[in-house]
UniProtKB/Swiss-Prot annotation:
Source lineage: Bacteria, Thermotogati, Thermotogota, Thermotogae, Thermotogales
Intracellular or extracellular location(s): Cytoplasm, Nucleoid
GO cellular component terms, semicolon-separated: bacterial nucleoid; cytosol
Listed name of the protein: Nucleoid-associated protein THA_1374
The family this protein is said to belong to: Belongs to the YbaB/EbfC family.
Database matches in InterPro entries: YbaB-like_sf, YbaB/EbfC
Gene3D superfamilies (UniProt xref): Nucleoid-associated protein YbaB-like domain
Record's function text: Binds to DNA and alters its conformation. May be involved in regulation of gene expression, nucleoid organization and DNA protection.
Complex and partners: Homodimer.
Species per Swiss-Prot/TrEMBL record: Thermosipho africanus (strain TCF52B)
Amino acid sequence: MKKLKSFGGKNLSGKSMNQLQKLQEEMQKKLQEVEEGFSNVEVEVSVGGGAIKILATADRKVKDIEIDEDLLSDGETLKDLLTAGINELMEKIEKIREEEMAKVTQNLLPFGF
């Protein structure tokens, strides 16, 4: 059987290739589980001193938006606060997603990869 060169100049035998394939399949399964779990993770932001609250899940679905009635008469401020709130929410969600995905990959990758 022909050996393939891998990272660091090491040879990969058929057995090693099978192990890598199993590792890849396990990682894909774990990542899918984490992805599905994001629908159960709620993220909330509050902007404008609590005038606007936005609730979403880590799978990027907005569940609720609360707006102080006093803001409804000031369209420009409402727009600015909604924009700021949504941007802050998306940043929080991305941070959560990156951290959870990193946990999976760190736990599954063998030392040296």
